[in-house]
From Swiss-Prot:
The gene is hel308. It comes from the Archaea. Keywords: ATP-binding, DNA damage, DNA repair, DNA-binding, Helicase, Hydrolase, Isomerase, Nucleotide-binding. This is ATP-dependent DNA helicase Hel308. Monomer. Residues 224-411 form the Helicase C-terminal domain. Belongs to the helicase family. Hel308 subfamily. It comes from Thermoplasma acidophilum (strain ATCC 25905 / DSM 1728 / JCM 9062 / NBRC 15155 / AMRC-C165).
Length: 674
């Protein structure tokens, strides 16, 4: 069967640039099951055409005048999917992506035909109104195997379970990598299973044991990693290498760059001084880059974009890349199969290895992909053989985590899904955790959660279970109840910035900064009168204090060793928690709300209070705002009335940018006058 034989409008073919492809068997079978009104789990390798199945399901749902929600586990994947699914606009669909604010109303979904959300965003929207799902005909769960991820998995599982509980008629399309218990996942979702090992680009896997290459049943001696990489690049291929640490990614990329000439005209630059710009610009002209979570969001996006454009030929990355965006290459090398963790050295999981190697072979460019594991000892060689010859681990639910049960129990009561302990159990019966673990363990966890929530003032029984004002606000804000208690503690003491950032830093959502400056942390605690306070929270607080004093990323890296990407991740969470603190002030201390709202904006932007107005102008971040302020333009009105020549004279402002900023400032100023 070809795409044209699906019976769709001819414009559907344009989603594939007019190419009338023959459907793969698993695509045809999945679409057949979807047309029968079945839930479907599709378990196939990377780049095996799952997107076409999603296109088809979303388009058919649109033709039935129903909406589709597409769930992904990561923001980077949401942006990638939005770029792909936006092509459906040519068929008349209204497509929207939403990945930010967790306090939004879900009403906007009614205005669109297809909405792309992260798991967390979807879950937070359902906290406000789960019955929005009654307007939804299709729920696409991408990367459903990530349910087995301890940190991200429970949220995806929760969204799927709420959907099935609230609207049993919603169709579910779950897209998965190859997993060993795909049938169990299908059974949980009451779905048909479509499973295949087919790959459009064949994959060859092997082991490089020191200088011995074992590939396709053959052995080749005297082979080095550098040699294989050079041969691949010279044959117009691209390479991904995975290593165990950031430092190793940087050092290995620098070493590999030496084997190539500086032919590529690639340079990265940021508005703000950033330690990694210089490091990358040393090797980018040679077509090599490193990629890890310490890079800023913009730096990672730049590297991914240049790799897709085939200007960057080699990326050395940590395993975070394999869990993120779809970035295939002809050759994938897993350089390290172990990593350091809190419990010492451990082996990567089979699923992680398969996710990395599965990226070998770029459709449309490569006739085949090669996935290699490099090892240097006999024991590692045996481990590598096991990786290549065995299936990935089964997907196991982590929804029974104590904090997750407490969080979801409060949410179920707040959403109106549960009015009694038995109602809560009915909800949990729709989860994978229940199907894998049964009732007894859950009853114990639910009982403990209810006691905690009632004791701490989140719920009450009268006689039905109801949320208090604190419980409702906590659930709507999408924060952990324990974190809400930490934030509430703030209102019992001095209402100043230092105390606020300390209590924000106490919250479990913020991973403490691992800095060695105990003295400054203890001094901070002494200054705020909490000498026996939490030293890890104090360390985070002093970094946040530097951030809102406009410390640059370079300064923070030089002083604390904090990479830009790590800083951005903490800022994002501190932004949300400071917003939550301002919301909670309406209950506990309304007179400090304005101060907390200002602090929220300062954390979001990394600014002192004097440039608050200027960062409200679109396109003006903290660096440009400070330059405008120092040049005497200290308000939106000042910018709106300035001449382009005056702004153009400020460092970093082009003629185009100056005119755009003036225009935007005038728009804001005119609205304020009205």
């Amino acid at each position: 069967m070809k795409i044209s034989e699906l019976g769709y409008d001819r414009a559907f073919l344009q989603l594939f640039d007019g190419n009338d492809f023959q459907l793969y068997d698993h695509q045809r079978m999945a679409i057949e099951q979807i047309r029968k009104g079945r839930n479907v789990v599709v378990s196939v390798p990377t780049a095996a055409g799952k997107t076409l199945i999603a296109y088809s399901a979303i388009y058919e749902t649109f033709q039935r005048n129903l909406k589709s929600i597409y769930i992904v586990p990561l923001r980077s994947l949401a942006m990638e999917k939005f770029s792909e699914l936006s092509r459906l606009r040519d068929l008349g669909l209204k497509v929207k992506m939403s990945i930010g604010d967790y306090d939004d109303s879900p009403d906007f979904i009614k205005r669109y035909d297809a909405v792309i959300l992260t798991s967390e965003k979807a879950d937070s929207l359902l906290h406000h109104d789960p019955y929005i799902l009654n307007d939804v005909g299709l729920l696409v769960l991408d990367e459903i195997h990530t349910i087995g991820d301890e940190s991200r998995g429970p949220t995806l599982e929760t969204v799927a379970s709420i959907a099935r509980y609230v609207n049993p008629d919603v169709r579910i399309l779950a897209l998965s990598a190859t997993v060993s218990n795909a049938m169990e996942l299908a059974s949980w979702l009451d779905a048909s299973l479509i499973k295949s090992d087919f790959r459009p680009v064949p994959l060859k896997t092997g082991i490089l044991y020191r200088d011995q290459l074992y590939l396709d049943g053959k052995r080749r001696s005297g082979v080095s990693i550098n040699q294989i990489i050079r041969e691949t690049v010279e044959d117009n291929g691209q390479v991904l290498m995975f290593v165990s640490s950031r430092k190793k990614a940087e050092d290995t990329a620098r070493d590999l760059a030496q084997i190539f000439g500086s032919d590529a005209n690639i340079k990265i630059s940021s508005d703000e001084t950033n330690v990694y710009d210089d490091m990358l610009n040393e090797i980018l002209p040679r077509g090599v880059a490193f990629h890890h979570a310490g890079l800023s969001n913009d730096q990672r996006a730049f590297i991914e974009r240049e790799f897709r454009a085939r200007r960057i030929k080699v990326i050395v990355a940590t395993p975070t890349l394999a869990a993120g965006v779809n970035l295939p290459a002809r050759l994938v090398i897993v350089r390290d199969i172990t990593r350091w963790g809190s419990d010492g050295i451990s082996y990567l999981t089979n699923m992680e290895i398969k996710q990395m190697i599965g990226r070998a072979g770029r459709p449309g460019y490569d006739q085949y992909g090669i996935g290699l594991i490099y090892v240097s000892s006999q024991s590692s060689y045996e481990a590598a053989k096991d990786y290549l010859s065995t299936d990935p681990e089964p997907v196991v639910s982590y929804l029974g985590n104590e904090a997750k049960v407490r969080f979801n129990t409060l949410a179920a009561i707040s959403m109106g899904l549960a009015r009694s302990p038995s109602d809560i159990m009915k909800f949990y019966e729709t989860t994978l955790f229940f199907s894998q673990n049964g009732k007894d363990l859950l009853e114990e966890k639910i009982s403990a959660s209810l006691k905690f929530l009632e004791k701490n003032g989140f719920i009450k029984q009268s006689p039905d279970l109801r949320t208090t004002q604190l419980g409702k606000v906590t659930s709507d804000l999408y924060i952990d109840p324990e974190s809400a208690l930490r934030l509430v503690d703030f209102f019992d003491g001095p209402a100043d910035v230092d105390h606020a950032i300390y209590y924000i830093s106490l919250c479990r959502e913020i991973v403490p900064f691992n800095i060695k400056d105990d003295y400054s942390a203890m001094e901070f605690l002494d200054d705020i009168g909490l000498i026996d306070g939490d030293i890890d929270a104090a360390k985070t607080a002093i970094v946040l204090r530097d951030w809102i004093s406009e410390a640059s990323y370079k300064y923070l890296y030089d002083k604390y060793g904090i990479a830009p990407g790590d800083m951005q991740a903490r800022i994002s969470m501190a932004d949300w928690l400071s917003y939550s603190l301002a919301k909670l002030s309406s209950i506990y201390k309304p007179e400090v709300r304005r101060m907390l709202e200002i602090l929220n904006l300062r954390i979001k932007e990394g600014i002192r209070e004097d440039i608050l107005q200027l960062v409200l102008i679109p396109g003006v971040g903290r660096v440009r705002a400070r330059r405008l302020y120092d040049a005497g333009l200290r308000s939106i009105e000042d910018v709106a009335s300035a001449s382009p020549d005056r702004i153009k004279a400020i460092y970093g402002f082009s003629d185009t940018l100056a005119n755009a900023i003036i225009r935007r400032a005038r728009t804001i100023a005119s609205k304020e006058v009205r």
